[in-house]
Amino acid sequence: MPRTFRNPILPGFYPDPSICRVGDDYYLVNSTFEYFPGLPIFHSRDLVHWRQLGHILDRPSQLPLDGVYASGGLYAPTIRYNRGTFYVINTLVGGTSKSGNFIVTATDPAGPWSEPYWLENAPGIDPSLFFDDDGRAWYVGNRMATDSRYDGHTEIWLQELDLAAMCLVGEPCVLWEGAARDAVWAEAPHLYKINGQYYLMIAEGGTSHDHAVTIARSGEITGPYKANRRNPIITHRHLGQDYQIVGTGHADLVETQFGEWWMVLLAMRPYGGYFYNLGRETFLVPLRWEEGWPVVAPGSGRVALAERTPDLPEQRWPAVPACDHFETQTLAPHWNFLRTPRDDFWSLCARPGYLRLRLRPERLTDLANPSFVGRRQQHMRFSARAALEFRPQHDDECAGLVLVQNNEFHIRFVITGGATPTVHLVKRSTPESNPQLMPIIPGTDVTLAELPIEGSRFYFKVEADGQAYSFYIATEPESWHPVAEGVDGRILSTPYAGGFVGTYIGMYASSNGQPSTNSADFDWFEYLGLDEN
C-alpha cells in the first residue's frame, strides 16, 4: 500500500501559501493580516512535515501595523529564490503610516530579513516575482481593471523589476483578466517557465466558496496568453456547501528534485454548518502534465483529506510541546500579537518561568495593540488550559483567556477586579451573521456568565467539540467548576463575522481605558488538539 498523509499540511489559519525549493529543501510562507510577527516561514524536506523557522517580518521597523483594521495588514506573500538570495514580496493593506507592495530579502531563510524595499507605482495586491533564465526579473500582480465594467473586475499585470535599484522599470502590460467570462477577482498570479513556455496561474472567483485556480500560457512573457480550455484546473465550488473541503484556490506550484509536481493551495473545512472557525488552511495536492497543461489531483480532480505521499524521503521534525512553561528567553514562533507592539507590555524575564502581561488601557475591542499573546486554533476539537496569577486592583482590570476572530467578534473569559474578584464570560458579536466578508460589522457585549471567585491563582480551561465551546475555572489543579458549557462558537467563523482570518486563542490583560500599574502572570499555557477521526 502506498504511504498517505492527511490534509491540511498546515491546519488552522495559514492562508495564501507560497512555496519554493532550494536543492532538497522546501520553504513556505503564508498571509498573516493584522497579526505580528508577520509571514511565518516553514521548512520541509518531504512536503508533508513542516517546522516553523520563524517569521519574515519580526521587527517593528519592518511591519507598521499600527491602527490597521481587522483583516487589513499583510496579504498574500510570494517566496522565491534566485542566485543565492531569498525574496519575499508582499502587500500591506490599510496601513496608517505606510501601505503598498514591498520586497524583503535574506540569504538565510531563517533570517534576518532585510528592511522593506517599498515599490512605487505598483498598485493592487497579491504580487509575485519571476526570475527568467536570461537574468531578468519581473513583477506580476493584480489591480482593478483599467476599463472596469463590474464589481470585482480585476486584471493581471506585469512589469520588469530592477533588482539592483529595487524599482519597477519599463512599461507595464496587462496579461489576463481570468478564464471565466466576467470573472471576478482575478488575483494570486504566479509565473512559471516550463519547457520554453510561460505559464500564468491565478485564482479567480473570490476567496470564499467560489474560489478556483485557472491557468494560461504564452511563448512570450508579455503574452498574449491563451487560456487552458479545461479551466478551472481545480475548484470545489460545484460540490456544494456540505462538502468536507470548500473554497479551494490561491495556489502555487513546486517541482521536486525527482521531477514530481505538487500544488499548495488554501481551502476551508466547514463544520457545524457552513462555518470554518479554523480559517483558510494550507493543503497539498499532486499534479502532472498532460499535453502541455497541468492536471491537478489526477483521477479525482479534488483536494482530498487523505492523499498519497510525495516520492521524497520522509523527514519528521521534533514535535512542538503541547504545554509552554515560558522558561525560554523568547516566545515560541507560534505565538502572535495583534498589530505592531510599540512598548514592552510582555516579559519572560520580569518573573522567570512566567509570561507577564502588563495591564494597559487598550482593549480587545480597539483597533490597537492590546496586551494579548495568542496562537491559532488548529483543531475542531481541542482543549486549552492555562494557569494565571493575578490580583485585580480595580473594577476595570481584567486578565484571562480570549477566543478571537476580530475586535468585534470574540469571547473573553477573564477575572475582573474590585473587592471581590469575579469570573466573567463575555461574548462580543452581532445578533445576525455578516453576509459580506468586509467590512466588519460592529458588535456588542453580552455577558454569558459571571460568578465570584476567591484567591489569586486561577486555572482556566476551554474545550471545543465542534461549534460547542465550554469554559471551566479552578483555584486548585483539576478541580474544575463549569462556567458555561456548549457556548455557540459560530461567531468565531468568517461566514458569520466577516474578514479573512481564523480563530486565535490566547492570554489577555487590560485595564479597559484606565491607567494601571498592575500585571498578570501566566505560569503556563497548554493547547492540545483532540482526535477528529
Question: Residue locations for each model-derived region?
Answer:
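Carbohydrate-active catalytic/glycan-binding domains of CAZyme proteins
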Residues: 1-533
